[in-house]
Amino acid sequence: MPLVLERPHFLRDLVGRELTLTDWFPIAEERIEQFAEVTEDRQWIHVDRERAERESPYGTTIAHGFLTLSLLSRFMKEAIQIRGGVRMSVNYGLNRVRFPSAVRADSKIRVRFTLQSLRDVPDALEAVFDARVELQGSDKPCCVAEWVVRYYI
């Protein structure tokens, strides 16, 4: 269930707080293969299941770290809805990203979003989110990112 805000300035009251935890989302092998094609990153650890079963320490194919990272936008739509006062939101960048553990094909991930900071910039509010992508069945996150989003008002 998303956190629903009537206006973007209501984010000010949430700085320093965990905002939401998304539902689990499957990372199917087919999605990994499609991402490999789109990005032209066809390294065998992502697309060759037989070789990965034989040679990889993970025992199967794994998702690209950038695939996991690219899903933050999808998860944010599930996590937070701002009903009014936003013309558009823009992915402004990342301050820091790490991939502490691998996402095996056919596993599930979800995201915890914490609002680290919020500041006024010309025509927008700039939010920095701590995004911790969790892997079902693991205590260790598979991605940790400081994500900068601008909400143009």
Go through the PLM ranges and name each one.
Residues 1-14, 99-153:
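HotDog/MaoC-like acyl-thioester-processing domains
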Residues 2-63:
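Catalytic strand-loop segment that frames the active site of acyl-thioester-processing enzymes
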Residues 17, 21-23, 31, 41-43, ...:
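A generic structural signal for short beta-strands and their flanking turns/coil linkers
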Residues 20, 24-26, 98, 148-150:
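Generic structural detector for well-ordered beta-strands
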Residues 21, 70, 111-113:
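A generic structural signal for residues embedded in beta-strands
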Residues 59-60, 73-112:
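Hydrophobic beta-strand-centered segment that forms part of the acyl-chain substrate-binding groove
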